[in-house]
Design a protein with these regions (language model features):
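Bacterial N-terminal signal peptides
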Residues: 7-18
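N-terminal secretory targeting modules
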Residues: 22-24, 198-257, 261-268, 433-439
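Extracellular carbohydrate-recognition regions
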Residues: 23-69, 206-212
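Short carbohydrate-recognition loop motifs
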Residues: 70-97
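Extracellular ligand-binding interfaces
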Residues: 90-171, 188-193, 198
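Short beta-strand-plus-loop segments that form exposed binding edges in beta-rich domains
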Residues: 182-188
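Oxyanion-hole/transition-state-stabilizing segment in secreted/luminal serine hydrolases
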Residues: 263-278, 292-336, 341, 352, ...
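Catalytic His-Asp segment of secreted/periplasmic serine-dependent ester chemistry enzymes
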Residues: 358-439
């Protein structure tokens, strides 16, 4: 973790340019006691935005059809000293938020030493989470999770949050025309208030952020609002399940390691699992939402200790793409780090490295393209003996590359038919590896 990022290539290149010779303005004030007609205040919903022109605005009508039990409200409020504030309330929704939208802002002068600061009061966040976002060019935004510090701030009144603006910058981002320089998004259920939002040329950050260059290879628990309650208990339950299997002389000969797609073998894929893998006393170590660093944390905290499977099937990385927008090289580095960890902890086990599955309907999907860029680099991680790479993605797609909802209803997770396709496509290589002599 870091309080400020240093030596980012994009910052260095900018500071060496002529545009950096002029001192940045002292601050870009986005919200305070002064009316700012050039700043639009927006309430965010999953598929819509709603401008706050009066005292409050809700997204309830837009939510009614798809999310009938959900609610989002953004209202003007006051701080104890009478200063202007905004209060966001949301209930049972995966995305809500307050955003400040402006004419294009050139934030490049602020990247090297600038900060984003705002006052925050958390009234309720037991069942929710927060995320701070800053735009970084057309169709680009970067985020800093604020789940744990947000919950820690609950009931403690107003607090000043100061983040290094470099927390939101990656190589290649374009901060020359940012139209949404601030958003605070909520998930689950909660209530928070904000005030005095500004981007300053200086300041001392008081809130840490992960380094985008190393986050995928740095072991971490999955501390999302929707995972905190179950993720660590599931890890402990899986440790106990593995120990019990070993005690009963049914040590797993096959282990699957991955994210929700792997965890789905316990749900939609359960009938297929029983047909193909129960005979190997197979163990499912899939955890919904996991990114490469979360799998790495589990491996380093006992996930496969004491086991000696013939084969471990590893597929991970689609959440690096979908939840955080990692560069392909970062995700590949995380996969490589997990392979090294598995090799160290399971020295007699062969690893079947499976290409990340296709997602979204068409080949033009940006997220699918990122996954394909990752997959293109994975064969280099395999030696054909200890680590074998397998790409079964063609089995899921029509000839023109379309992914059908008949096998992945949400265009990401297989249903039972999708798991049957996976098992059939993987079976020849898996059977071959299971039949080989031990390393």
């Amino acid at each position: 973790m870091r309080l400020a990022s240093t030596s980012l290539p994009l910052i260095v290149s900018y500071l060496l340019s002529g545009a950096a010779s002029a001192a940045p303005p002292a601050a870009v004030v986005l919200f305070d006691d002064t009316p700012r007609p050039d700043v639009a205040i927006l309430a965010l919903a999953p598929d819509t935005t709603h401008r706050l022109d009066g005292e409050k605005v809700t997204a309830d009508a837009a939510l009614r059809t798809t999310f009938p039990d959900s609610a989002i409200e953004l209202a003007r409020s006051m701080q104890p000293d009478g200063g202007a504030a905004l209060t966001l309330q949301w209930r049972q929704i995966w995305k809500s938020g307050v955003a400040l939208q402006t004419a294009p802002q050139d934030l490049r002068p602020f990247l090297a030493r600038g900060t984003l600061a705002f006052d925050l009061k958390v009234d309720a966040l037991d069942a929710g989470g927060l995320m701070v976002k800053v735009g970084c060019g057309p169709s680009c935004e970067r985020q800093v999770p604020y789940v744990l510090p947000g919950r820690a701030a609950q009931g403690k009144g107003w607090q000043r949050v100061v983040l290094a603006l470099s927390c939101f910058a990656r190589e290649g981002d374009d901060f020359s025309q940012v139209t949404r320089p601030f958003a605070l998004e909520g998930t689950g259920s909660g209530q928070v208030s904000i005030a005095n939002v500004a981007i300053a040329a200086g300041g001392t950050p008081n809130t840490a952020c992960a380094d985008w260059r190393t986050v995928a290879v740095t072991p971490a628990k999955l501390d999302e609002a929707w995972s905190i309650d179950w993720w660590l208990p599931r890890h402990r339950q899986k440790l106990g399940e593995a120990r019990q299997m070993v005690r009963k002389a049914r040590s797993p000969q096959l282990v699957f390691i991955g994210d929700s797609i792997t965890q789905g073998w316990e749900k939609e894929g359960a009938p297929v699992w029983q047909t193909h893998y129960a005979k190997f006393d197979a163990l499912d170590l899939g955890f919904g939402g996991d990114r490469t660093e979360n799998v790495l944390w589990r491996l380093q905290n006992g996930a496969v200790d004491g086991l000696d499977p013939k084969v471990a099937v590893l597929m991970i990385g689609t959440n690096n793409t979908g939840l955080r927008g990692d560069f392909p090289a970062s995700t590949v580095a995380g996969i490589r780090r997990n392979l090294d960890e598995i090799k160290q902890r399971l020295p007699r086990t062969r690893i079947l490295l499976v290409a990340i599955f296709p997602r979204d309907a068409t080949p033009e999907s940006p997220l699918r393209r990122i996954n394909e860029a990752i997959n293109a680099q994975l064969p280099a991680l395999a030696d054909g003996n200890r680590v074998v790479f397998l790409d079964v993605n063609g089995a899921f797609l029509t000839p023109d590359g379309t992914l059908s909802k008949t096998i992945m209803p949400d265009l990401l997770h297989p249903n039972e038919a999708g798991y049957a396709i996976w098992a059939k496509a993987m079976q020849p290589e898996l059977d071959r590896l299971m039949a080989l002599p031990r390393l």
